[in-house]
Amino acid sequence: LFHPEQLISGKEDAANNFARGHYTVGKEIVDLCLDRVRKLSDNCTGLQGFLVFNAVGGGTGSGLGSLLLERLSVDYGKKSKLGFTIYPSPQVSTAVVEPYNSVLSTHSLLEHTDVAVLLDNEAIYDICRRSLLDIERPTYTNLNRLVSQIISSLTTSLRFDGALNVDVTEFQTNLVPYPRIHFMLSSYAPVISAAKAYHEQLSVPEITNAVFEPSSMMAKCDPRHGKYMACCLMYRGDVVPKDVNAAVATIKTKRTVQFVDWCPTGFKCGINYQPPSVVPGGDLAKVQRAVCMISNNTAVAEVFSRIDHKFDLMYAKLAFVHWYVGEGMEEGEFSEAREDLAALEKDYEEVAAEGVDEPEGDDY
């Protein structure tokens, strides 16, 4: 599946330290990475863009991830970059300095990705436990299988034939109203185990309703607290446009799904005839049809404000900051990244409120 020449590994880890991943260890390995990317891109006839997967809680994902994105922007300026980023969860934490790493990393995600899909382990754990999968103690493999379904749905239209195919740049066009407002929520349905799939009726309206459920969101964030700006529904399998239109019409009448008033249509639908495939012996049932939703909702700001709050508590005491400065970072970078995120939260507030009264001074 992966050519061994394209697998790059390092000998040391970034010790949960953004500065180490970005400046110390990252600097040594990033040229090798870009060299391999260049070889691959030279073989492409029409390079469309990059999919970047990282987690921003640790040091390597945040530091090296940011560095790589920055360098890709330099080398391939116009190509689109889609990020799938795992953010720290509200309750489940893997490192003390997660808030620092996330804030520093989001600073470059803001500038160097065109669309970023936010994921968080806790939300996906809950989906595994609570949904029809009933996995008592989900492992990372279980989580990854769910995430991979979403990613697979996003790229199906590049790989197979369908009635309404959606290519990668189309996501950007339809989902991003302003360049900075590009952090997406994702959800997938049906998440159902093989044992239960036999007696469940999984019609198009049913799976469409399911992806709008707050409990289906792959990041801990309640879409009912915000408004939708746009959403992309990718159906795959046995689905016809008539059913999709009917299902979308029903969603539009629901009080719980609110759209911003400056975006009246808000839905982009794609249909692909290739039914979803599953890992043999995996948790998910083989189903006739499935849908994946990527949505731009103002409630995503909750994810950022949670991290910012934790960041502020530690930074007020300058706790752990010396580890970062010791690896060649400047203290000013902390406040710069934090201000950038504060501005982002403000951007989301304004977007949600626009139309009620026009904000003074146009930032865009």
From Swiss-Prot:
Subcellular locations according to the entry: Cytoplasm, Cytoskeleton
Looking at the keywords, is Membrane present?
Answer: no
Q: Which reaction does it catalyse?
A: GTP + H2O = GDP + phosphate + H(+)
SUPFAM superfamilies cross-referenced by the UniProt entry = Tubulin C-terminal domain-like (SSF55307), Tubulin nucleotide-binding domain-like (SSF52490)
Question: If you read the UniProt record, what top EC class would you report for this enzyme, in one word?
Answer: hydrolase
Alphabetical UniProt keywords? Cytoplasm, Cytoskeleton, GTP-binding, Hydrolase, Microtubule, Nucleotide-binding
**Cofactor section:** Mg(2+)
Matches recorded under InterPro entries: Alpha_tubulin (IPR002452), Tub_FtsZ_C (IPR008280), Tubulin (IPR000217), Tubulin/FtsZ-like_C (IPR037103), Tubulin/FtsZ_2-layer-sand-dom (IPR018316), Tubulin/FtsZ_GTPase_sf (IPR036525), Tubulin_C (IPR023123), Tubulin_CS (IPR017975)
Q: Please give the GO cellular component terms listed in this UniProt entry.
A: cytoplasm; microtubule
What does the record list as GO biological process? microtubule-based process
Site feature: Involved in polymerization = Y364
EC number assigned by the record: 3.6.5.-
Q: Which GO terms describe its molecular function?
A: GTP binding; hydrolase activity; structural constituent of cytoskeleton
Assembly and partners? Dimer of alpha and beta chains. A typical microtubule is a hollow water-filled tube with an outer diameter of 25 nm and an inner diameter of 15 nM. Alpha-beta heterodimers associate head-to-tail to form protofilaments running lengthwise along the microtubule wall with the beta-tubulin subunit facing the microtubule plus end conferring a structural polarity. Microtubules usually have 13 protofilaments but different protofilament numbers can be found in some organisms and specialized cells.
- Which family is annotated? Belongs to the tubulin family.
Q: What does this protein do?
A: Tubulin is the major constituent of microtubules, a cylinder consisting of laterally associated linear protofilaments composed of alpha- and beta-tubulin heterodimers. Microtubules grow by the addition of GTP-tubulin dimers to the microtubule end, where a stabilizing cap forms. Below the cap, tubulin dimers are in GDP-bound state, owing to GTPase activity of alpha-tubulin.
Official protein name in the record: Tubulin alpha-2 chain
User: Which organism encodes this protein?
Assistant: Anemia phyllitidis (Fern)
Quote the gene name from the UniProt entry.
Answer: TUBA2
